[in-house]
């Protein structure tokens, strides 16, 4: 076998591993966690308005914090944070919302890293249209 024939599959393997590392989490597990924990306050259904207490999280990933659901009055702290919801900012915020954005009304942390990664994967799927 030639070196060229071995190199191409190796490159594809490395690219696949790198892509997986860039997108941690399992969207299906995140949806299950969301249903059990987050739906007490939020919704992720575009046909519904916000949740009972918090805003709809449809389209959250990639959006600026404090905007997106016109039916919800976001806190001045969240609106003033200028955060854009990415893997990193969501992970930091969900770890301890009150520390990440002092004055936010979001009070429930997600302490387990795997749960945060799964939730963020679910939020990404809601933003990309694949649930």
Which residues are covered by each model-predicted region?
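Bacterial N-terminal signal peptides that target proteins for export
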Residues: 1-8
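Detector for the c-type heme attachment site
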Residues: 42-48, 62, 95
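Hydrophobic h-region of N-terminal signal peptides that target proteins for export
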Residues: 11-21, 127
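C-terminal capping alpha-helices of c-type cytochrome domains
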Residues: 84-131
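Electrostatic cytochrome c docking/interface patches
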Residues: 17-35, 45-50
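N-terminal, post-signal-peptide region of Sec/Tat-exported proteins
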Residues: 48-71
């Amino acid at each position: 076998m030639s070196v060229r024939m071995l190199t191409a599959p190796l490159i594809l393997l490395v690219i696949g591993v790198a892509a997986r590392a860039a997108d941690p989490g399992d969207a299906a597990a995140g949806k299950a966690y969301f249903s059990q924990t987050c739906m007490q306050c939020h919704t992720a259904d575009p046909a519904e308005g916000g949740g009972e207490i918090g805003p709809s999280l449809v389209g959250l990933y990639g959006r600026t914090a404090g905007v997106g659901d016109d039916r919800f009055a976001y806190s001045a702290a969240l609106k003033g944070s200028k955060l854009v919801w990415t893997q990193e900012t969501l992970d930091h915020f969900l770890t301890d919302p009150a520390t990440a954005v002092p004055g936010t009304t979001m009070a429930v942390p997600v302490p387990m890293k795997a749960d945060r990664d799964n939730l963020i994967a679910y939020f990404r799927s809601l933003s990309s249209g694949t649930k």
